[in-house]
Amino acid sequence: MSLTTAQILDLAPDASSRKAGQDQAKPQKWAGLGRAGTVIWGEIKGSGASPYRTVADLAGPASKCTCPSRKFPCKHGLGLMLVDAASAIADGEPPDWAAAWMKGRESRAAAAETRAKEPAKPVDERAQAKRRQAREDRVGAALDELDLWLRDLMRRGLAAARGEPYAFWDRMAGRLVDGQAPGLARRVRALPGLAAAAPRPGAPRPEAALGLGLGRLALLLRAARRLDALSPEQAAGVRAALGYPVTAEEMAGRPDQADTWAVLAHAVEEEDRLTARSVWLVGRASGALAQVIDYGTAGSPLPPAPAAGQDFLGALAFQPGDPPLRAVFREGRAGPAAQAVIPGAASVAAARDSFAETLARAPWLERWPVRLSRVRLGRLAAAASGGRTDSKTGSLPAFAAGDETGCLALGADPRLPSLLAVAAGRPVDLFGLYDGYGLHPLALVTGGHLYAMPAQGAQPVLLQVA
């Protein structure tokens, strides 16, 4: 098993690591290269007297290196995998240090399986109930304060709100964090950026964006007041939006959904001092969409995940919520993609209807994944729309994805030129996130190949991953 060059480059934690990894992808720099199954290893000269020892499991993918880098994978791990992608490393007997790493991975996997089968430790239900009630009280107080703040803001009007400094919004967000409602705090912190943004294609005008953001906050607040009137899954979705974590006990009781999951794309974002990675998947048999989110820090790297363009053969467990989307990996393995398709892709009209149905169930959602079949990408000229402007944006979107049933504006993105070049005017299948105004593409299928947007938004070139 080998990963493609594009799949490996998409694993890079940032643009500098990607470039540095390519610099290490020269076989002459490596010594003691070898392979055992999906595991490869080698040694490369570093800054010290002893070479760095690097080992990687392509099935993870996962890697380990003796260099001092805190990035994962480091440039040496990327370089080793790139060497194998260019020309498969020959089989060999693993040295002691590589064998020890392989054995350690097997031991940890076995231990995790054993822990999963162990009966849960007894819980102090009284203490747990006390902690739960204390949080409910703090969140309730935070909701009261947010309600008053929103009413005051609306009395003064959106024009006054647009003139408020960042500190005005940050103070409210800080009080929501203190009230243990981090989901609401994140939304409040995003509001000044909406108000100050310049008009751009595939997005509402700044004042409309601010009004929409405040409206979603108000709807979420109202839903949070009526949890008892909602179904258990709907209530769980509201609580997740407020920032309540899903406990291990809750996830242990969730059913597994087995399928061959096509990994369409990765997306990496920086949130405060955390690195958040989303892995977007769709079931080849079920057509179910899934988003697996992992967090990492400088001292705690992101866990391994299947690369974009691979298939994950196994099970996911979906977190409670309506509609379901967030999931976690259960048992399974990554492997080559069966074929480059976007399961469940449909027309633009069908995608609009699906988005509307989803929004009706959870109107505070900010965006939702959509799949389009055989759409063309291009500039939407005034002549094509009878000279009309978009009533929401006030101007025509620069580019759109469309078919005979309609079109969706493409959100502004520095990677769009690469996307348009790959599409080359041909009908393509497209996967992306839609917010009601613009579609933000993440993956494209054309000519029997899957192309993914780079995980890092700063990387401008689309990657052929399958």
Predicted segment positions?
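Long, low-complexity, compositionally biased intrinsically disordered regions
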Residues: M1-A466
